[in-house]
């Protein structure tokens, strides 16, 4: 659906790339970089190969030492903790807000030690975390902030003084992903890093290209993480429509909300409207835990796609158990992981489709939860 509407523009730009033979670091990459800088109102954008690399490169640019501690959320996609461990750093994970599922800022300060260097908050499902509070904590403790903005590109954060700023441009560094399902998605993998620091931008531009600033002279330990010209061309077309795409997601979310407003046992996404414009990368419901799996089965039988984001917190994932996280530190995550279920959310959803999904949900009985399992 989305491709059909912009097919002629996308095909034209792809043909230009093929004709130019500039498949790596072609002029279109710089053009997209400039346009994204203008859209975000940020000084520097560094395109890269994917969102995971973006996080890793951001950490590499900060001259951290093995064993330095990085504070982040317990509830997100694996990339956030993965890159910390890959670089020999220590993840210190924090429980989440039960309403938004974002990192709970009130729990951060108690986790800070003399080894803490960075906070990585995630703007989950399209909604900004309480980044202003996190920046204050970071400034107070001389820490740096990397915003994981893979799921909220185009969202604006509203400060207490009513000023607005794009998520991903507020901390020292921001990162994003252009995975196809993202709000701004390419037709493969892609990512980008944002910063207002000239020094950090210079360093990261070297890191993404094997540590080179001049060909075959390697000044940094780097990686091979360049956004290819084909993906840049596609993203450059779609960037013009990002606000429209996000508006479409918001309208679909509103229709879902209306459909579920009289269903007591279904909690629609909580929106912190005083600080954020939710752009709904996911539309995630919260339901009684004993009902969630039967609801998922019901949707599956009726050929309605759904997602469980996420079935486990980082502290329970097999790959990270060597970090010896304590289960008792994550009461909210332990509860939420059994309650969340995400419904179809994309730019081409129709009223008819949303009504069908909502009507299908209404056909299954939601039993009264026990006292211990109440939301």
Regions found by a protein language model. Give the residues of each.
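PLP-dependent aminotransferase-like
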Residues: 60-156
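Positively charged, low-complexity/disordered segments
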Residues: 368-371, 375
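PLP-dependent aminotransferase class I/II
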Residues: 12, 29-34, 39-43, 106, ...
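Conserved active-site segment immediately N-terminal to the catalytic lysine
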Residues: 147-185, 214-219
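Phosphate-binding glycine-rich loop
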Residues: 21-69, 83-87, 93-95
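N-terminal "arm"/small-domain region of PLP-dependent enzymes with the aminotransferase-like
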Residues: 1-22, 27, 302, 344
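Active-site PLP attachment segment
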Residues: 169-205, 212, 232
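Hydrophobic/aromatic ligand-binding patch that stacks against planar heteroaromatic rings
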Residues: 82-84, 137, 166, 183, ...
